[in-house]
Amino acid sequence: MKDKLIIGRFLPLDTVIHRLDPRAKLIFVFLFIIIIFFSHAPLSYLWLALILLTVTKLARIPLWFLIKGLLPVFFFLILTFMMHLFLTKGGTRLIEWGFITIDSNGIREGILIMLRLGFIMIVSTILTLTTSPLNLTDAFDRLFKPLKYIKIPVAALSMMMSIALRFIPTLMEELDKIILSQKSRGSDISSGSLAARIKAFIPLLIPLFISAFQRAEELAIAMEVRGYDANAERTSYRILKWQLKDTLLIISLVPIAAVSLWLGHTF
């Protein structure tokens, strides 16, 4: 499980994407997700796929490694597609069998929503693979620093985000240990029907939650012993410097959005 889910991991490579300011990457991902939500045509998603492929190549992330990260959420994507397939009506009636009907709009919307969620997962994964959790936390803290003046605990939220990202691989590793422990006791969770596999997976949740709470308590005690204060003013060892390449990254969103909208309205 931990080898499949890659979001939250960091690949320490030396590429042009890794060297970008984490604030610029965070802004780019946020605006790129907005562009994804405003894209409603297949050609628009093909264009966005080319952009993601280019970024992946520049970051030297193996394509198979990135696609493998979608496998844990593949069931969720298929479930989303099936919901739109049967619930979205309109267009040409393709199948009608009793109360079950499938229309062309259902297939189209199901595919687009599945692509939309998949692209959001991919661009978020690229962000975590090319940005260390510490830099990501610093970027979040710097971008939302003005919110401190309206009493929003930005530093605490940044720390929570950093801990959450670090806990994802840890929890997946813990889940792997629990699965191996259950298999050694004769439990079979990898075969049978989908309902049987889901039923066999439910008993794993209780020890996983207990382990998560124990790790959270240990971390809280360790931070308290070291004198951590969420309200204290903090400094950073690494100073973030905004450069021309970071500005160009943000400007590149203009043609990306323009082409996506043009393809959506033209075809």
Predicted feature locations:
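Alpha-helical membrane-interface segments at transmembrane helix boundaries
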Residues: 63-67, 71, 108-112, 202
